[in-house]
Amino acid sequence: DVYKRQHQYNPIEYIKSRIKAPESIVKKLKRYGYDSSIDNMVNYINDIAGIRIVCSFTSDIYRLAEMIGKQNDLTVISVKDYIRHPKESGYKSYHMLVTVPIFLSDCIIDTKVEIQIRTMAMDFWASLEHKIYYKFEGNAPGYISRDLRECSDIVSMLDAKMLSLNEAILEAKAAQEAALLREEKDRADKEK
C-alpha cells in the first residue's frame, strides 16, 4: 500500500512463502558435512523459512529490496545479487537473508528468513530449471545446461524489453496528460 501510494501502482505480482521440510533440512546439513541437530540447523541453515516476492520489472526488485532493508522490524544479514552476478547455471534473483523477531510467550527469538525477489520471467525460468535439474539429480547433460543458460539470456532480454516498454508507456501517458492540461488551460484563457 505504501509503495502503491508513492508510485501509483503495486509492483508485486504475487508472494510465495514456505517452510523447509525437516527431511530437506537433514539432507542439507549432511551435504554441508554437519550432524542433524538443532544447533547446526540454527547456525548453518539460512533458508528454513523463505519468502519469494515476484514483481513486474527489474527496477521494482531494487526498489522493493531497498524498502525491505529500511524496515525497522527486521535485520538484513546479507545480500546476494544474482541479477548483476548470475549463477553459472544462468539463475537470476535477488536474495536477502534477514532475521525477523519471533515473539514467544517467554522470549523473543531472531529467526533467519531468506527473501528472494525476482521478476515473473525470472521466476518462470527458475521454476523450470529446478524441475529439470531435479529430474537429473543435479547432473544434467552439458547441452541442457547450455540451453538453460541461453534461455536465461533470453529471459534477461525479455525483462529489459518489458522495462523499456513500461517506461515508454509512462512517458507517453505523461505527455498525453500534459497536452490535455495545456488544452484545458488554452480553452480557459480563450474564455476570459
Model-identified regions with their sequence ranges:
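A structural signal for alpha-helix termini and helix-coil/disorder junctions
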Residues: 31, 35, 70, 74, ...
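Short, charged low-complexity intrinsically disordered segments located at boundaries
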Residues: 18-28, 55-60, 94-101, 181-191
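Residue-level detector of functional hotspots within protein domains
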Residues: 11, 15, 37-39, 80-84, ...
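Short, small-residue-biased leader/transition segments that mark boundaries at the very start
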Residues: 2-3
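Intrinsically disordered, low-complexity acidic/polar and Pro/Ser/Thr-rich regulatory regions
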Residues: 164-192
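A glycine-rich, hydrophobic loop/mini-helix early in the fold
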Residues: 8-49
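Long beta-strand-rich cores associated with HINT superfamily self-processing modules
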Residues: 42, 55-164
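Short aromatic/hydrophobic contact patches that present stacked aromatics
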Residues: 50-54
